[in-house]
A protein has these predicted regions:
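C-terminal target-recognition/interaction regions appended to catalytic cores
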Residues: 135-276
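Generic N-terminal helix/loop capping motif
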Residues: 1, 5, 25, 233-236, ...
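Class I S-adenosyl-L-methionine
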Residues: 2-182
């Protein structure tokens, strides 16, 4: 639909009209407040036609609406993930939350304490191998007694051989041209950088060729638990189902720490209304 990946079909893509179905539920349920999240392209695709249609429909339903782009890294999430948000209320125009931190958490902060697995290693349930090495890791562990979903993809040998050619924190520029394949995006075969937030976690984070979602130095893509940490799901979240469903649960989610910041902002706005 609106994503930077794949074709941008705009008005010719039926997925871009799913907002109408969502707003039909709003019309039926009449919540006091609701939030819409989507990729930032929803604001600009087809010269802003979809953005304007969404706002017009929300207003017609009797809601105030404020919208803008928020980056998860500004809210304590160790990931640079920009998304468009529409915050809608029957009572007043809601402000978007302000950033909660100017010091961005990093990949190292998020996953350095997790077992260093090779391709195909790990289990759905395992034990921690070290004490937490950062405040974020302590926060992630909460009171979890075990580690769940820390199981590495079993890559084909050709993928492992390619990753062995890529130095720590580097990318496909180190691969011979005859091994690049058909991937067009610059980020394919990329490794995460320890001391930076990760790029956006998507629903194919366990594929070595997908993007910059390979371990900083190990020859594999990140595990579901590592991806969950980078999304700010704490270790008590257990992801169930087939691999494809687990990837979608993690990669399609609004990071919990960002969701909390939005919820806190809405709560503050309603406290002001009650005081008035």
């Amino acid at each position: 639909g609106f994503s930077n990946k794949g074709k941008k079909l705009g008005l010719d893509d039926s997925r871009n009209f799913l907002f109408r179905e969502f707003l039909e539920f709003v019309e039926c349920l009449e919540p006091e407040v609701f939030v819409i999240e989507n990729v930032r392209g929803i604001l600009t695709t087809s010269n802003g036609w979809f953005r304007d249609q969404i706002i017009h429909k929300i207003n017609d339903l009797g809601y105030y609406v404020n919208y803008g782009i928020l980056n998860s890294r500004d809210f304590g999430v160790p990931q640079s993930r920009e998304r468009a948000f529409f915050i809608c209320s029957k009572s007043k125009m809601m402000r978007l939350p302000k950033e909660t931190t100017s010091k961005h958490r990093t990949v190292r902060d998020a996953i350095e304490d997790l077992a260093y697995l090779n391709s195909g290693e790990g289990d759905e349930i395992s034990n921690y191998v070290t004490e937490p090495l950062s405040s974020y890791q302590r926060y992630m562990r909460k009171d979890s007694k075990h580690l769940f979903n820390h199981k590495a993809s079993n890559h084909k040998q050709i993928a492992i051989e390619k990753l062995k050619m890529i130095p720590p924190e580097k990318g496909k520029e180190y691969l011979p041209k005859d091994m690049l394949g058909k991937q067009l995006f610059k980020s394919t075969w990329g490794r995460l950088k320890w001391d930076e937030p990760s790029p956006t976690i998507d629903t194919r984070f366990d594929a070595a060729s997908n993007g910059t979602n390979n371990h900083p130095f190990l020859h594999r893509a990140i595990t579901p638990r590592e991806a969950a940490r980078l999304q700010s799901f704490d270790d008590r979240f257990i992801f169930l189902g087939a691999k494809v469903h687990i990837r979608k649960q993690i990669g399609n989610a609004v990071p919990p720490l960002l969701a909390k910041a939005i919820a806190d902002q809405i709560s503050k706005e309603y406290l002001v209304i009650e005081e008035e």
